[in-house]
Design a protein with these regions (language model features):
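Active-site-adjacent beta->alpha loops and helix N-cap segments on the catalytic face
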Residues: 45-55, 157-162
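Conserved active-site carboxylates
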Residues: 1-39, 72-149, 182, 186-302, ...
């Protein structure tokens, strides 16, 4: 297939590699091959948003942020129910906040997948979001909501005829979408390996990111206005920055140097010793240069308080090479005595944040996290995740 024609219309909702075990498609490749000035993704989660925005900015493309929700009649009831997969697209920053809140809420009702019900979804249907439905039985829930559209994608002729009928009956516009599970036809084999037999979607209709012409050929009964509408909706989307968490500012009456000096006395370390003095000076200068002081204050405070209530691991990973960590009671290993390198922990040439691994008893871990929430606020504490990839090292 000609690369130039793959993205011949603005796609509002493309699935990417971040629809884990459901779809395949590397973000960088999808964006690189996009020929329009806008592009939307809608995965089962928001994991790819930050990378998506960065890649779009590099390629001068307007990013459109969406999320695909599994919607049922009663999310609290943990039973298998008819599921409608609906896409919510943010028109502005408030729309992003709506999606974040709904995404978090849906995790509370996880049953094979994160789910929400129609009533909860309606609470967030305002002028800040666009809602697409690829199914039609529950359209009555959204009558009167002006940003609600029926989504037409390559499926059976009977299904497409029904979409047309519902559109005319309820006066709901149709928007053409590419219901993809991988980018190109030749990617089908990789998709099947990545998602596995259990999650594989098998159908005879188009599963790759289709061109406008492929969609028209597959959906002859869908009006031309459905293709123009995707471009019109893209124009309604504002350009905005994703919200960023505010770094915690630690309230301290002393400096890191003063804390290290006080701790050195307790640990019987002579800071007049040139080896220790030079190492401490070098570490503190780099920590200050990279603006990591608050991070060390927070971790030290957390570990010292935890040690009063539980066993805390002595050190693990590269942080054991830091004299500052040792003097702040974060670790219990003297890096100079054991000839450990600080540069494995923080290096002037590295842009990544320092990573301090701390071991708490399994049964006490949640209490440590709760103390952080109590100290700094619920909105300032979050878990991080790691994305595993099927690739050689």
């Amino acid at each position: 297939m000609d690369e130039e024609t793959i993205f011949s219309m603005i796609n509002l909702k493309i699935r990417t590699e971040y629809s884990f075990r459901k779809a395949y498609g590397r973000l960088a490749d999808i964006i690189k091959n996009n020929k329009g000035d806008s592009l939307g993704i809608a995965d089962f989660g928001t994991w790819g948003w930050v990378k998506f925005k960065a890649e779009c900015e590099k390629n001068n493309i307007k990013p459109i942020f969406g999320l695909e929700f599994a919607v049922v009649l009663n999310a609290e009831e943990k039973t298998k129910q008819p599921t409608n997969y609906m896409t919510m697209i943010a028109k502005n920053l408030k729309g992003i906040q709506n999606i974040y809140e709904l995404s978090t809420y849906s995790q509370n009702f996880f049953y094979y997948e994160a789910r929400i019900d129609y009533e909860k979804l309606l609470d967030y249907c305002d002028d800040n979001v666009i809602l697409l439905s690829g199914d039609h039985p529950q359209v009555s829930f959204f009558k009167g909501y002006k940003n609600f559209y029926l989504e037409a994608s390559p499926k059976s002729p009977a299904w497409l005829r029904r979409i047309n009928e519902v559109s005319k009956k309820h006066n709901i516009p149709i928007v053409a979408c590419s219901d993809n599970y991988y980018p190109r036809p030749e990617d089908k084999g990789v998709y099947q390996i990545v998602v596995g037999d259990r999650n594989r979607v098998t159908r005879t209709t188009i599963q790759h990111i289709a061109t406008k012409w492929e969609l028209k050929a597959a959906m002859p009964m869908i009006p031309d206005s459905a293709y123009d509408l995707s471009d019109e909706l893209a124009k309604q989307i504002e350009v905005f920055d994703l919200p960023k968490a505010t770094n915690v500012k630690y309230e301290s009456k002393t400096t890191l140097l003063e804390m290290c000096k006080a701790s050195a006395k307790r640990r019987n370390i002579d800071l007049s010793n040139k080896v220790y003095a030079d190492r401490l000076d070098r570490e503190l200068k780099l920590i200050k240069e990279k603006q990591f002081e608050d991070y060390f204050f927070v971790i030290s405070d957390m570990v010292i308080k935890a040690k009063k209530e539980m066993l805390v691991g002595p050190a693990r990973g590269s942080s054991a090479g830091s004299l500052v960590c040792y003097l702040l009671d974060i670790t219990d290993v003297d890096p100079i005595k054991h000839d450990l390198m600080f540069e494995r922990f923080i290096d002037v040439n590295r842009l990544d944040l320092p990573d301090i691994d701390i071991d708490f008893p399994d049964v006490k871990r949640e209490s440590v996290i709760q103390k952080l929430r109590d100290t700094y606020g619920e909105d300032c504490v979050a878990h991080i995740g790691t994305v595993s990839r099927l690739k050689p090292k």
